[in-house]
């Protein structure tokens, strides 16, 4: 009887596996047919010859799959034509990029593509109204419909796309008023070159002027102030105000300024002699000239006082709004820029909400802390916008103007939900400022080590694991963003992992280590890879080591450079202490006592400990790449991360639409 029961269970399990396999095969076959139908109508030049029935569709040009379903379709600049209606059957699609083609017609109903995160359809011939089905794609992070022939109004339901980071609608024929798109995460926004009218909503008014230009009837900040011409005849300011007043009947309204005194007196002016008229005019002219000179003298004197008072603040101030979409001041007009650069200028990256340098100087400031690269401040601007400003005056001693600007161009291009993105920078001979988004929930260091008194709320395991995964994704994105330069962070530590309003980890201060004096690096000994002790340069492998130390800090609750050995009372670095404890088979002694209150997490903690020990291998070649570390951590968490808009292809970020074109920018010293 037992054998029969076992046989039945085994048979049922086999049937379920077979059914699942059939379903996956059927779905894969459906995706294959969908792509072949699209090829028949769109590929008139034969660029998709690899798409045929004899090969696996997951190996076709521009196609990526997950579990035999098409999840990514990137077909850019290959002269595709026709409609994209057939693609709506690709229900597992996460990334769709068809920019720089000749596709046309209206956008079909995309509501079936519920997994879509990135949609790039720019530089085509699409037409019709804004595709309202897009507003139902609640996982969407980036939407680019620019340089097409769309028309009509923008639906206010765009506010339902709460994760949206990019909204590019420039160079179309959209009209009507811009809706109040109040999306807190929106970073990259442009509606220039359309037919919008009315006032710019307050929620968008701090984006640069360039993103609203070429809309003749658009007004309000940052464009010209709207002038309200009321059609209400009772409103003041109209030339025919007397007609409009309810106190005047139409028949009593004067037709000329003098007729109110009667018709006879209007002829008296003709009796005034010519000499008297000239005398009156000369007298008025002399009086007006005297008053004008007096006012000019008073105002000029006040202006001179103010100019002298504020000359140090205002001298050489110049705000540059970058295009393309990043600053290119180091590439053109070298002589002019050198002159401006000596005095100082502020450069904003496109999509950043603008403000004047004076606004920053007037803002209420709160010091957040001092680090190896300078002092960080929280600045609250007059409009309530909060930014973080890092002052590098004392730290950046080895970088020249050209080297500094080239590095800023590269760093300013990096955009990811797990990075604290660089918004703007100011460069002058005596002052260097970096402007970032303000992260209100502090740093990982403070959450782990701050206020360990009795009233403290400990950091639970789920939150620690989420922070570890987010920081890993951010660092992996930096490493994969530009293969030719092999970018590094250079200073991974818990104070450089910040938390945004949603509790997501964001890596900060990346790419600044090349400017730091050697003594600054020495202060991060607890995180420093062994190979850096003899003065070698930072590498991606040394970043991996530092990240491994960070994981050990999360697991143990101990500061990396403050671990006591227990017998001698001396201190030892955290990786060596963990290795010694594990070697003596006291693994449970490694973990933070605050984690012991949680049940059924020991297996996950041991798994993360193994990752940390692999990252802190003494030999750099034995350490894993960050892309692999991300996968290992996500496996512990129990699946892929839906929170990251750039999770697809994290090891090939250069080819990912998560990045703008030419991520590497110009050459830079690294």
Curated annotation (Swiss-Prot):
Residue intervals of the Protein kinase domain: 362-636
**What does the entry list under GO cellular component?**
plasma membrane
Q: Which GO terms describe its molecular function?
A: ATP binding; protein serine kinase activity; protein serine/threonine kinase activity
Q: How does it sit in the membrane?
A: Single-pass type I membrane protein
Q: Which of this chain's residues are annotated to bind ATP? A: 368-376, 390
Q: Which residues carry this modification: Phosphothreonine?
A: 463, 616
Q: What keywords sit in the KW lines?
A: ATP-binding, Cell membrane, Glycoprotein, Kinase, Leucine-rich repeat, Membrane, Nucleotide-binding, Phosphoprotein, Receptor, Repeat, Serine/threonine-protein kinase, Signal, Transferase, Transmembrane, Transmembrane helix
Provide the membrane-side ranges marked Cytoplasmic in the record.
Answer: 296-670
* Extracellular topological segments: 30-274
Concerning PROSITE patterns, the annotation shows:
LRR, PROTEIN_KINASE_ATP, PROTEIN_KINASE_DOM, PROTEIN_KINASE_ST
List glycan-bearing residues.
52, 79, 102, 109, 112, 149, 182, 190, 268
Database matches in Pfam families? LRR_1 (PF00560), LRRNT_2 (PF08263), Pkinase (PF00069)
List, alphabetically, the PANTHER family matched: LEUCINE-RICH REPEAT RECEPTOR-LIKE PROTEIN KINASE PXC1, PROTEIN KINASE DOMAIN-CONTAINING PROTEIN
Q: What is the name listed in the Swiss-Prot or TrEMBL entry for this protein?
A: Probable leucine-rich repeat receptor-like protein kinase At1g68400
Q: Which organism is it from?
A: Arabidopsis thaliana (Mouse-ear cress)
